[in-house]
Regions:
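Asp-based phosphoryl-transfer active-site loop
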Residues: 34-47
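Conserved acidic, metal-coordinating active-site core of Asp-based
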Residues: 130-131, 135-250, 254
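Active-site phosphate-binding/coordination module
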Residues: 50-155
């Protein structure tokens, strides 16, 4: 299927203006969309990590229409934004890059894949001296220095408050990871610079039985081999008995590419990574241009 671009050239516009300016009015799919999977950061959320009121309302409208809306994030469960969680009717959350699926109604985990202890030991040996984040039972813990000075490790200024309000700092992360060696949903390695990231990425080839991805130039994210948003979405779709052709997925990062490839309709925001764009069927306006809201409205109209 050719990639269709669904964005207007101007970045200063309202949703109504975008509707008038959109060059593509074709029906996006001939299949009824029953499930919409949403990546959050830099996709559904704006670049300042906030949720636009227009986007929140459109998601709520989708839920009210009977469409299953699923969060699909690299974030740990306990760091998901309240602005999204408070939208009534969202039940399932794929978290930690697909390492777990949370049922927020029953407050249980449907599925969970933790890193194997021998993998964690190999990881600590391979990346000795690096700064880590570790997710345990949905709670993110991070290196104490990173918590105190996130900018020094490449954190965006817009995400400083996110780090401070969601992470629990630990000064001895390797020791912490060993104490919780059988409980780790996933581990992030702080890169700081693109050059250092390239060096660390090369080292990941020494690991086996892992899923390695990245949602940000400052992070390398490592989970169990069974993880991945695409694999998790496939498992959830099987539980809900929804075929891929009735699924739409939105994303922006490398860690979203497999999810977009699995969905019958893979949609990348215009600001997405090259790998994510390549996996998409459609490209919509950026996260700061209400791309998710605009496209969901089109999907609801098509439905």
């Amino acid at each position: 299927m050719p990639i269709i671009h669904l964005f207007a050239p101007s970045v200063n516009f309202t949703i109504c203006a975008v509707r008038a300016m959109m060059v593509t009015v074709m029906k996006m799919t001939d299949k009824k969309i029953k499930l919409i999977a949403l990546d959050l950061d830099d996709t559904t959320l704006r670049s300042d990590a906030s949720l636009a009121p227009e986007t929140a309302q459109t998601i709520a409208n989708a839920v009210k229409s009977g469409t299953q809306v699923v969060i699909a994030s690299g974030r740990a469960f306990k760091s998901l934004p309240q602005s999204v969680l408070q939208i009534d009717g969202i039940r399932y959350a794929i978290c930690s890059n697909g390492a777990c699926i949370e049922d927020m109604h029953s407050r249980t985990r449907l599925l969970s894949f933790t890193l194997r202890p021998q993998v964690v030991e190999r990881l600590l040996e391979t990346f000795s001296g690096e700064r880590f984040e570790a997710f345990v039972d949905g709670q993110p813990y991070c290196d104490g220095e990173y918590y105190r000075e996130p900018l020094r490790f490449g954190c965006s200024p817009a995400y400083i408050d996110y780090v401070k309000t969601t992470r629990i700092p630990v000064d001895d992360m390797p020791g912490f990871m060993r104490r919780h060696i059988a409980e780790l949903d996933s581990v992030d390695i702080m890169c700081g610079t693109l050059e250092h990231r390239a060096e660390l990425w090369e080292k990941t080839k020494r690991l086996s039985d892992v899923y390695v991805t990245s949602s940000s130039p400052r992070l390398i994210e490592i989970s169990a081999a069974e993880a991945g948003k695409g694999a998790a979405l496939q498992r959830l779709a099987q539980i809900l008995n929804i075929p891929p052709q009735h699924i739409a997925a939105f994303g922006n990062g490398d860690n979203d590419a497999d999810m977009l490839a699995f969905a019958g309709l893979g949609i990348a925001v215009k600001n997405a990574s090259k790998r994510c764009l390549a996996a998409a069927d459609y490209i919509c306006p950026t996260n700061d241009e209400h791309g998710v809201a605009i496209t969901i409205e089109k999907l609801l109209t098509s439905n």
